[in-house]
A protein has these predicted regions:
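Residue-level recognition of single "structural anchor" positions
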Residues: 1-306
Length: 306
């Protein structure tokens, strides 16, 4: 044991509670910093690709801000594991793991600010930086029996300084128009029986065939069985792309047997809406995608834990 360690051990009993707490928090920060650096460095070692040209001819090129830098032999550009990611330029790496844990706990910004001692603006900025990373965790393709249904969120300008429509006072007013309209944001959700989910913000108003072609076609295997309600857009989509289609006319009943229903996707709709409304009291439309990806990770964690 080094002499300095003995000195520290002898000094600690003479310290005040606040001083000991400060030392403990600093040690935790160092440990968290080392962990996040290891995670970041392992990422570049696993991918082994240049973020600019995709080449795997790399060699080490010194260190900066605690991170290894690399030079690509093909394009001669230098980079680190965070280059061209949403985390580029973010500081306080020792707080990243506590922040991500706070996101897994669905903590609101003010609670995060108090828990890990960062500025409220930083907490907001980081939320959307980390949320953008979550998009990569989505499955590429759904297989087998695939349930598809849409749900709707009222457009929201939450946080905007300048509104392009009259404000909704704390959500007490109803939507300006009855039923589906351009005041409603369509979110298409699909799931297969392997508990893989995909969510897409398709546009304003009712779902249509063009949106299905644009957002969904490349994410379903051609031999899948699509189970939907009777909306004509789904019928047209399946006919055009030669996909087997089962229609559930009554959400409480199946079409031919108990295998064909959309109960899983409708249950997911309920959980998304409950989470967004009860935890965040609604979110701005421009950030809705980020919250969908965030909820996706939370659902995936629940499935894996169970």
């Amino acid at each position: 044991m080094r002499p300095i360690i003995n000195e520290i051990i002898n000094i600690i009993p003479t310290m005040s509670h606040e001083e000991r707490t400060t030392i403990i928090e600093n040690l935790k920060s160092i440990d968290s910093y080392d962990k996040i650096i290891d995670i970041i460095e392992n990422h570049i070692e696993s991918t082994n690709k240049c973020p600019y040209c995709g080449s795997n001819h790399l060699h080490k090129h010194g260190k900066s801000a605690g991170l290894e830098r690399y030079m690509c032999q093909s394009c001669k550009k230098t980079f680190n594991a965070l280059t061209n990611t949403p985390l580029t330029g973010m500081r306080k790496k020792e707080l990243w793991l506590p922040y991500m844990q706070a996101m897994l706990d669905s903590k609101v910004l003010r609670k995060i600010k108090e828990t890990i001692n960062i500025n409220l603006k930083t907490a907001f900025y980081w939320r959307h930086k980390f949320s953008r990373l979550l998009y990569k965790d989505r499955p590429e393709v759904l297989n087998g029996i695939v349930e598809v249904d849409e749900t709707y969120f009222r457009t929201s300008c939450k946080g905007n300084k300048i509104l392009d429509k009259p404000p909704h006072k704390r959500g007490i007013h109803k939507a300006a128009k009855r039923g589906l309209s351009k005041d409603q944001v369509c979110v298409l959700v699909a799931t297969d029986r392997g508990n893989h989910f995909l969510e897409f913000i398709t546009g304003l108003g009712a779902v249509n065939g063009n949106w299905l072609d644009k957002y969904f076609l490349n994410h379903i295997s051609i031999d899948s069985i699509l189970v939907t309600d009777g909306h004509k857009s789904y019928v047209h989509f399946c006919n055009e792309n030669h996909i087997t289609h089962k229609v559930v006319k009554n959400h409480r009943n199946s079409t031919e047997n108990n295998s064909y229903h959309i109960q899983n996707v409708n249950s997911y709709h309920s959980r998304i809406k409950s989470w967004i409304i009860s935890v965040f009291h609604g979110v701005a439309t421009k950030y809705l995608n980020h919250y969908l990806w965030w909820k996706h990770v939370l659902e995936d964690k629940v499935i894996k834990d169970s």
